[in-house]
Amino acid sequence: MTALVLAGFLGAAIIIVAFFANQQGWLASADWRFPAANLLGSVLMMGSLLVQWNAPSVAIEGFWMAISAYGLVRSLRA
């Protein structure tokens, strides 16, 4: 398993933990850390897709990154 694939698993774990924390009420979606975690996770997952290409996954991760970046900017401006 390459470092990029491991990074992809780490990215998935970050996204899952952020989502779980949000569902538990521990991390509000308006908190800058929520979109930051989603952005970091999706960047790491995108890196793993360089090794194991999957066009639909690249598409969803691209949108996930863009929406997370937008949410992070909004959170930091508030």
Model-predicted regions and their roles:
Residues 1-13, 57-65:
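Structural signature of hydrophobic alpha-helical transmembrane segments
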Residues 1-2, 24-28, 50-55:
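Membrane-interface helix caps and helix-loop-helix hairpins in membrane proteins
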Residues 16, 42, 65-68:
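Small-residue-rich packing faces within the transmembrane alpha-helices of Major Facilitator Superfamily
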Residues 17-28, 69-78:
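C-terminal ends of transmembrane helices
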Residues 30-38:
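Cytoplasmic-side transmembrane-helix entry/capping segments in multi-pass membrane proteins
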Residues 40-46:
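Hydrophobic, membrane-inserted alpha-helices
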Residues 53-78:
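C-terminal structural segments of small proteins and small subunits
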